[in-house]
Amino acid sequence: MRNITLFFLLGICCITSFAQETNQRLKISHVCGDFYVYITYQSYNGQKMSANGMYVVTNEGVVLFDTPWDTTQFQPLLDSIYVRHHKKVIVCIATHSHEDRTAGLSYYKKFGIKTYTTKQTDEICKDRNEPQAQYTIDKDSVFTVGQYSFQTYYAGAGHTPDNIVIWFPKEKILYGGCLIKSIEATDLGNLTDANVEAWPITIKHIQQTCKNPRYIITGHQDWTSTKSLEHTLKLLEEYKKK
């Protein structure tokens, strides 16, 4: 009887675990060392689409790049990070003005997290009455938090007029956001604010400045390939031919 009961309970646990996995709204994946990608989801053109953000765990606290696309995951992300690493998020930098990057800025400011965008992003958010960061970055800057240093780099317009990338030169990690398309992407995605003419030049500037990246984190879909810069150029070339 005890064996039957145990088997039944194990079965229920497996079913519950499977249900949680299939309904998951927040996923955290390890990149390397202290670097992690977090993924949330929204519906785009009638399909479920992932949005990738990144965070790095430092001696002083956690630095977050972009905020969740799914607004229900602002707090679960903070909670998940604290449970995993026993550290709080202390800095958040959004890489452009779209909601899949900036939606949580106001929420995170309430918790004393220092939030940043470029001045250009801030002006766009202000004009559209959308969440703004507490601080603005006037030019390409180097941040040092704990044992890690990284650069904010504006290479030019592309997906949006204000998109920046984050470059960790020592670790060779490039966080590209929506400016860099995943190798899974079959088109350029949302072009509402895009500058398709400038975009290839911007990507080439990134290739020249952020050389030989070991990891390239794209804004959406699979981020595990280092060929995403080349793939973005290919998609742009295909778009020009249409």
Question: Where are the predicted features?
Answer:
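Divalent metal-coordination and catalytic microenvironments
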Residues: 34, 56, 66, 81, ...
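Active-site metal-binding motif and surrounding structural segment of the metallo-beta-lactamase
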Residues: 59-61, 72-116
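Short, electropositive alpha-helical surface patch
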Residues: 226-242
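Metallo-beta-lactamase
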Residues: 22-26, 30-31, 61-62, 69-70, 119-158, 160-227, ...
